[in-house]
UniProtKB/Swiss-Prot annotation:
Signal peptide: none annotated. Changing C89 to A/S: Affects stability and solubility of the protein, but mutant is still active. This is Hydrogenase maturation factor HybF. The keyword Metal-binding applies.
Length: 113
């Protein structure tokens, strides 16, 4: 379950930001999950709640936003949206794609008191 380590990293980022800005409590966090990140939302929510325990983010609302993946098609020279790793280009049906975005988990925003 790599969701746990991803959430640990996210909470470390949140903690650092809270310390830098003298924040005592985080009330909400927005995570952006790429379509190709291979994470389960329920596992992220469960893991996030566990790793937030005892931190400034304990009890905060977690908002998850999904980001479509984008890839460069070497056959038609276009940036295209894809939804799985072994996808074909939706424009030319070529199979030579380079994934550019959509395979990560990012802390997009933090709401504080």
């Amino acid at each position: 379950m790599h969701e746990l380590s991803l959430c640990q990293s996210a909470v470390e980022i949140i903690q650092r930001q809270a310390e830098q800005h003298d924040v005592k409590r985080v009330t909400a966090v927005w995570l952006e999950i790429g379509a190709l990140s291979c994470v389960e939302e329920s596992a992220v929510r469960f893991s996030f709640e566990i790793v937030c325990h005892g931190t400034v983010a304990q009890g905060c609302d977690l908002h998850i936003v999904y980001k479509p993946a984008q890839a460069w098609c070497w056959d038609c020279s276009q940036v295209v949206e894809i939804h799985q790793h072994d996808a074909q280009c939706p424009l030319c049906h070529g199979e030579r794609l380079r994934v550019d975005t959509g395979d990560s988990l990012i802390v997009k925003s933090i709401e504080v008191e």
